[in-house]
Every structure is written in C-alpha cells, then in structure tokens.
Amino acid sequence: DHQVDPRRLCGAILEFLGDRVVPTRASEVLFNEDHRAIGLRGANGKSYRADHVVLAAGVDTGAITGIPQALTDLLRPVRGEVLRLRVPEALRPLVTRTIRGVVQGNAVYIVPRADGTIVLGATTREDDMVGVRAEGVHQLLRDAHRLVPGILDCEIYEMTAKARPGSPDDVPMVGRVGDGLTVSMGYFRHGILLAAIGSRIGADIVCGTEKDNNPALLAAVNPFRFGNR
C-alpha cells in the first residue's frame, strides 16, 4: 500500500491555509429566522458567518448545539491503541512497505515511516477507559511479532488511545442535513484514507454539484439512511 503520515498532512494543510484557520472549537450553529445555517459560534464566544456550514468535528460533533439530535445520537466513540516505535539503526529498514495482517482474528497494520519509525495499530474497543489499555498494547506487540519478529527490538516512544467516530454501519455520514448545513462525520478507522472523497463530496454539496457524484455513493453515505430523519 501507499501511505501518508496524517500528522504531517494536517500540518501541511494548516500551513497552506495560514491565517484563514481560526484556532477555536465550534460550539453552536447559528441560524437566521428562516432556520438557515448562517455561521458558527466558537468556544471563544465569537461568531463566524458563512454561506454554508460544513461540520466535520469527529467524535465531538454531538457537542455542537444546533445539529439534529437524531444524527448525533448515532455517533459512538470507538477507542483503539496505536503504538509508535523507533527502529534501531542496525535493523533499518525493518520493513519497507505497509504490512496488513490478521492474527488470530485481530487485524494489525505495520506502517514504516521515512524517518526510521513505525506506526503499529490498531485495536478496537468500546468502553469507558480514556487512557491506553495494557491489554491493547500487549495484543499489538504479540500480533506484530508474529508478522515481523524484529518488532520487539524497537523502542516504543509513543502510545495513544484516541476515540474514533463510528456510525451504526461504520460507514461515513456525509450530506446536507438542513438549509445551508452539511455534516461530514462517522469516518471510524478510515478518516485519513477517506478524507479525499469525503471532502470532495462535501465541497460538491456546498457548490451545488453533488449530483455529479455516483448516486450509489451518495446513498451509501447519506446521513439519513438509517431512517433517522
């Protein structure tokens, strides 16, 4: 597989956008008297006007006032451990391409980076533990060792367990949900992989050209496909 570093990609996008990025969290969708979305209120208390509002706030989307609850109730946080390891100089390159495998029913991926580090992931769990679960770390190292034994000689320099936004069928929810209001959420484990197509659909909706997309694709990601309108 080809691969991209999500952190470097996001950093590059922010750098490209420059001062067009407002460093605050959205707290409320603003509507006019006709109930058309006209902007957002940030956590900093300031209001930001927009011709069309696109919400892509991940698992925190439900915390934004003004989104139909029938939509936000469908999102659930799915946590999972990811390890980042540094390969010793003597073992480089430990792997030269992305490895995906299934070990005793558990999916595992090993992604090499150009700087000699490796991303190892990812577990999936739906519980209340916010931090890194020891069982998840053990599972990842055990399964990765079956695929690449040298993984145990690497240095663990970071462990994370972030919440990913899952929909009922684990497929994104992208579409217009009100006049001037579009959501793009529920990307689950594949946010970076589906970012290009998700942003394309969102942009087409804003520009009024969504009909140029495959109807089956639009139906597959329709936020109201669960009968929740």
Give each language-model segment a name.
Residues 1-16, 58-60, 136-143, 187, ...:
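Mid-domain beta-loop-alpha active-site segment that forms a flexible
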Residues 36-38, 117-118, 181-182:
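Hydrophobic residues embedded in beta-strands of well-ordered beta-sheets
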Residues 46-47, 126-127, 190:
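Short, surface-exposed beta-strand-loop junctions and turns on beta-sheet-rich folds
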Residues 52, 57-179:
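Active-site substrate-recognition segment that forms the wall
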Residues 150-229:
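C-terminal catalytic lobe of FAD-dependent flavoproteins
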